Each structure stands twice: as C-alpha cells, then as structure tokens.
Amino acid sequence: MVQHLTAEEIIQYISDAKKSTPIKVYLNGNFEGITYPESFKVFGSEQSKVIFCEADDWKPFYEAYGSQFEDIEIEMDRRNSAIPLKDLTNTNARIEPGAFIREQAIIEDGAVVMMGATINIGAVVGEGTMIDMNATLGGRATTGKNVHVGAGAVLAGVIEPPSASPVIIEDDVLIGANAVILEGVRVGKGAIVAAGAIVTQDVPAGAVVAGTPAKVIKQASEVQDTKKEIVAALRKLND
C-alpha cells in the first residue's frame, strides 16, 4: 500500500505555501497605452480582454487604468488558498467532471473518481479503486487496491490533531453509500461496510459490518458474489 504524507509534513506544506487568490477578469474598454504586469495572463481582442491574475496584483492595475474600462466582471472562487487542485495531466485514471482532488493526493493507476467526490491532501486512492459520487476522502485517508467507496461515504481525515492515525482501507473492501469511517479505523481486506454504517472500531478482514455504531453481522463469504462484485470494465481506460 502506498505510503501517505505524515500530518507534520502536510502541516509544513500548508504553512509554507504561498497563499493565492486567483481571479479571472472580463473587460470591455479602451486598452490603448496599457502596460500589463508580467504576472498577468491576457487574452482577447482590441476591445475586450480576459485577464488571469492574483487579486493583490489587480488592485494597483485597476487604480492605474480603471477609467479606461467600460464593463468589468470578476470571478473569484477562493481566498488565500494554500493548496491548489492536483494537476491530472499524467494521472492514469478515470476522473469525472466535478471531482475535487487536491495537490499531494495520490491517485493510482486504473482508479475511478466520480462526480462530486472530494480527495483531500495526503489521501491515497489505490489501484483500481472507485470513489463514487460525493464521497469524501479526508486528509491522509488511504485505500488499497480494488476498493469501492460508495456514494456519499466519508473516510475521515486526520491532519489536525496531527497525532491522530489515518483511516486505512485494505484491498477489495466494499463501503456502502453514506457510510462513515472514523479516524484511526482500519478496515481489513475483503470486508464489507453496509450503507449508512458508522464505523468506530477496526473491522476484521472478511467481515460484514452494519449499524450505528457498526458491528459484525456476518462474513463476506456469506454474501452472494453478484452483490460484492468489483467490475473491471468500469475501470477500463482507452486501449
């Protein structure tokens, strides 16, 4: 299983990161004689521009040239952000639109991350693992291979306090929709967590747990294969 960053390493990364407030500015007006700072990315025509820049850099620019602009629209979706979204260019996985994956998360080969899923810094999505819609992997939460994390499920994150142990999900585990796995819990290989379960203690390999708090109700070997099948075709990428 891939090793994740320690809590102390994540805290240091966030502390040292240059905080960013990126904005996108749409402009109509007269741009004659305008000099753009090197930090600006500028696109457009003689009458209209789109500028990508930091909010702090925009203010003095606007003070200098604002009288030349007729229409202004500014988009801002974060403030003093420390952690950017992950660059997925070289990620060999299926990532659907609307997934939020932060830098320093690890997405292994053949994984699937569905719409609305959130993968926080230091989390690990194992090879062939599916993170379903609106599921959340908190900081340092780690899954093994061929895991299914159901829609709306939560694997609790542990960055603060830094002494807490992360959630560990071993290979071939099925986690039902809206289940919650609390910090420090380890779910053993081949186990099944029922939908809506609140898991507060370690789950033995091959066990089925359900309820609030979750308790062992039977063994995964007693569950029909069709109800616990991991479908390889859903993880297939282009040939």
From Swiss-Prot:
Keywords: Acyltransferase, Amino-acid biosynthesis, Diaminopimelate biosynthesis, Lysine biosynthesis, Repeat, Transferase. Gene3D superfamilies: Hexapeptide repeat proteins, Malonyl-CoA ACP transacylase, ACP-binding. It holds the Pfam family Hexapep. The keyword DNA repair does not apply. PROSITE patterns: HEXAPEP_TRANSFERASES. Pathway: Amino-acid biosynthesis; L-lysine biosynthesis via DAP pathway; LL-2,6-diaminopimelate from (S)-tetrahydrodipicolinate (acetylase route): step 1/3. It catalyses: (S)-2,3,4,5-tetrahydrodipicolinate + acetyl-CoA + H2O = L-2-acetamido-6-oxoheptanedioate + CoA. InterPro entries: DapH, DapH_N, Hexapep, Hexapep_transf_CS, Trans_hexapeptide_repeat, Trimer_LpxA-like_sf. Its EC number is 2.3.1.89. The keyword Acyltransferase applies. GO terms for molecular function: tetrahydrodipicolinate N-acetyltransferase activity. GO terms for biological process: diaminopimelate biosynthetic process; lysine biosynthetic process via diaminopimelate. It is an enzyme of class 2 (transferase). Belongs to the transferase hexapeptide repeat family. DapH subfamily. NCBIfam families: DapD_Ac (TIGR03532). Catalyzes the transfer of an acetyl group from acetyl-CoA to tetrahydrodipicolinate. PANTHER family: 2,3,4,5-TETRAHYDROPYRIDINE-2,6-DICARBOXYLATE N-ACETYLTRANSFERASE, ACETYLTRANSFERASE. This is 2,3,4,5-tetrahydropyridine-2,6-dicarboxylate N-acetyltransferase. The lineage of its organism: Bacteria, Bacillati, Bacillota, Bacilli, Bacillales. The gene is dapH.
